[in-house]
Amino acid sequence: MPKYFDFKVSGYYLYFISKCIIECMHVHASDKRLTEAGSAKFFVKGNADTDLMKQGTLNDLDVRKIQGFIKDHYVEMYDLWSEWSDNGYYRGK
């Protein structure tokens, strides 16, 4: 499971699961084991906005902090994502 960064953001690792690269760019956030159980899932748009698809065990404050971090670093994160997947940014529902 590739991590976007080696450090935690608001107490959570930001990563994606290599089997999920068939989807558009997204970010999982998990504090312990890097599994989907209990993790949040954010789909990332080309303008740096995110759609929260699953909140997991994160509280609202942590969700907002992570969304802000993604907004500030989405280009760098996309560079890593695109090494694994040809699928681009999220285009909405």
What are these regions (language model features)?
Residues 54-93:
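Acidic, low-complexity intrinsically disordered segments
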Residues 4-7, 18, 34, 66, ...:
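Alpha-helical protein-protein interaction elements
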Residues 18-60:
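A short, structured beta-strand/loop element
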Residues 7, 50, 87-88:
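Short linear motifs in intrinsically disordered/low-complexity regions
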Residues 1-25:
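Short, charged/polar N-terminal "headpieces" of proteins
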Residues 5, 14, 40-41, 67:
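Short non-domain terminal segments
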